[in-house]
Amino acid sequence: MKRISDLVAGGGAEQCLQQFINQSTWEWEVVRRDLAHRLVEPLQPQALIVKEVVFPKNGDHSVGVARQFAQSVGRMLNCQLGIVVFLAGPAGSCPVNWRLLLPPAWDSDHGRRTRAHLPDHEHHGPKWQQVVEVVEETVRDWRLPAIPIVVDMRHDGDVSALAQALEVHGLNYVLRVSANRPAVTVRPTQAAPRTLSFADVISGSTRSNALIRWHLASQRPGGGQLIATRLPNEPLSSGHESRFRPAPARPRPHSQQRRSTTRHVAAEWPSTRRGARTTWLTTLDASALHQLPDYISLHDRISADLEAMYDLSGLRHFEGRSFSGWHHHVTLVSVAHAWQYLDPVTVRVGPVV
């Protein structure tokens, strides 16, 4: 904050900037929406990439802070957790929408809610639901192109719930999943039902004709190929009748009926390894599956972009405690990151300190 004050106002404006972030009432949603629309032309986005963001904290008064497991770093720590939506395309990427993930303890802690100015309607919810809400706002409410949604769900047990919810909203997705997670339940006519993992589906398809293969670009470490197969959900035409149904998901409201959607399972198989490097679940149809390597590359690139943002755009440098302050801070981070795409003159800056 002091560095911005010195550079922009010649010093002495730090307190005003703090107030602008923590106490002002400007609407962050409007700024994000307008920023996203301005970025569509320069970025030519091909996908919306959803990532987890982690804000390590020392105390326990900042909004949403708790000792909790951060999937993206693989450990427990005292932190705030959020999710961010990137517009991503060949020309670059930029974060355009954000959600703060509230831990369950914050629902009933009226003292901390009051001190953090947390709105009454903000509560803990499953991650998959938060993803659906922020994506729905970004695409439907802001009227952005309905491009595929790419999310890493390896460490989340609600893959099926997220997939079904996105299908209800008519949104295509590319979800990274754990190969050992349940994918479908096979129900032979004269045997007990058996649940197959995503790895089982891929393994079974390598011995059939229902498989699509691409050789991966040379820039992918290990080379190899990407293989994809349709996730069965109807009787197979084989020697015995079997019915494949999606693995069980959490209950959804009775008003939400999932439309019939073809799903594909894909695995990235390097030539130097015996097993798959990554496994994916997608609603891309057969004619669009050739674009899957591009979405995987975009997802990998965003991970590197996010790490750079922590330093270059000052993402982790929020010192306030309020709900609105957090949203103002991350919105300004989006604006700072977008400057390289919106300004015709490229400006190189050092890390924010």
List each language-model region with its residue ranges:
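Gly/serine-rich nucleotide phosphate-binding loop at the start of the catalytic core
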Residues: 1-19
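Short, conserved catalytic/metal-binding motifs centered on acidic residues
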Residues: 4, 47-56, 85, 148-156, ...
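Electropositive, glycine- and tryptophan-enriched low-complexity nucleic-acid-binding patches
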Residues: 15-19, 73-145, 274-278
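Active-site-proximal, Lys/Arg-enriched surface segment
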Residues: 25-104
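Short amphipathic alpha-helical "interface-anchor" segments enriched in bulky aromatics
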Residues: 54, 288-320
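An anionic, glycine-rich sequence signature occurring as long contiguous blocks
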Residues: 93-94, 104-106, 120, 174-178, ...
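Domain-level cores of phosphate- or acyl-group-handling catalytic modules
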Residues: 115-188
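Basic, amphipathic alpha-helical segments enriched in Lys/Arg and hydrophobic/aromatic residues
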Residues: 315-353
